[in-house]
Amino acid sequence: MNCYFEEGEVFTWIRDRERSGENMVVSLKMLKECHRTGSKQAMIAEDIRTGKKYFVKVLFCNDLEQVYVEKESKVQLYSPYIIRIYGGMLDEKNKRFITLVEYIEESDLSELMRGRGIAGDTWNEKMKVRNRIAMKFLLGIDHYMSMYRQDPIVHRDLKPENVLASPDGSVVKIIDFDWVHLHASNVTVMLRREQKGTPGYA
């Protein structure tokens, strides 16, 4: 039986120095569950000390070889257009991999492109915001491709639902880098034995 987090539960998330190169210890209180399937869970959590919010993403895996963490390196997706992944923690007792991710309160691109929640009182104003969002999205793609040209990182599930944007288009970030495909041998990577991703996008 999977050990899911419950709302109100307190958990200490630790990124191991041996695996990541630096320590990070955060005492978290689970606030709200966002998503749950048989093998995955996503929670909104709060740092008890600072009040800062995070997304906590959990992958349950019976075969821990499926999650491979190479000690001397890590994935660092630092970009203003990509949601930040702070790192992962391997909980061997409960057979789960726990990822700490930047939290932002924005709508996904599919909702905004349908005109739901997008800023602007007139059609022209809304179109300007849509164009601004589209431009920032393209800039984000170009930015991360140029950053990782030497060690390419392929998203594999890029779709409107995996892009968050503010109603006025001032913030646009690509999300869901939990399952990235990396063409490199010296990086931190979670390996998948079977094909993942959304059909039509992956």
Residue ranges and their predicted role:
Residues 1-25:
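Juxta-kinase regulatory segment immediately upstream of eukaryotic protein kinase catalytic domains
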Residues 145-166:
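Catalytic-loop of the protein kinase fold
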Residues 166-197:
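Activation segment/activation loop of eukaryotic-type protein kinase catalytic domains
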